[in-house]
Amino acid sequence: MKIRILSLMLLSLIGATSVKNGDDAPLFNLLNQDDQTVSLEEFKGKKVVLEWTNHDCPFVKRHYDTGNMQNLQKEMSDQDIVWLSIVSSAKGKQGYITNDQAKELTKKRSAYPSHVLLDAEGSVGRMFSAKTTPHMFVIDELGKVRYQGAIDNLGNTGALFSTDLSK
């Protein structure tokens, strides 16, 4: 009985820490592909897309192989929207990449992220409860989370981003 109660308490705490639409986005600092510290706070006043990615994920591969992700990244860049690709895979685990591999993947895929951020400890992934890839978050100029979920939840990714980012 004690284990059941403790389990329920733990689950309620886990649920309480997840980010909800309308919440302030948790602030973080991560190293990018060039080993420079990037802070979410430095983009206050700009719209930001967070893309949790794993180059070995079949869903990520599909979006990059078809050019869908690159087209969205380019479109967002043209609108001065910051795109942060985040890799939360631990060293020795599937999906882990080094700084050099991040640069190589970006070039090979002709991708347009503003930065590739390496979160090998998974701390930022846990802050946002990002568990799948590609898991997307849209943050407005005030630092509020306006969307979270799959890139293709609405079927038309362009509409998804133009709708959510125009708020």
Segments (PLM) and residue ranges:
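Short active-site neighborhood of thiol/selenol oxidoreductases, capturing the structured segment around
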Residues: 41-61
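A short beta-strand-turn-helix
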Residues: 28-48
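Thiol-/selenol-based redox modules, centered on thioredoxin-like
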Residues: 140-167
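Structural microenvironment flanking redox-active thiols in thiol-disulfide oxidoreductases
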Residues: 61-109, 120-125
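Cleaved targeting-peptide boundary
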Residues: 17-25
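Short, internal strand/loop/helix patches
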Residues: 103-140, 145-146
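Loop/turn elements at helix/coil->beta-strand transitions in domains of secreted/extracellular proteins
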Residues: 45-48, 78-83, 111-114, 141
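Sec-dependent N-terminal signal peptides
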Residues: 4-13
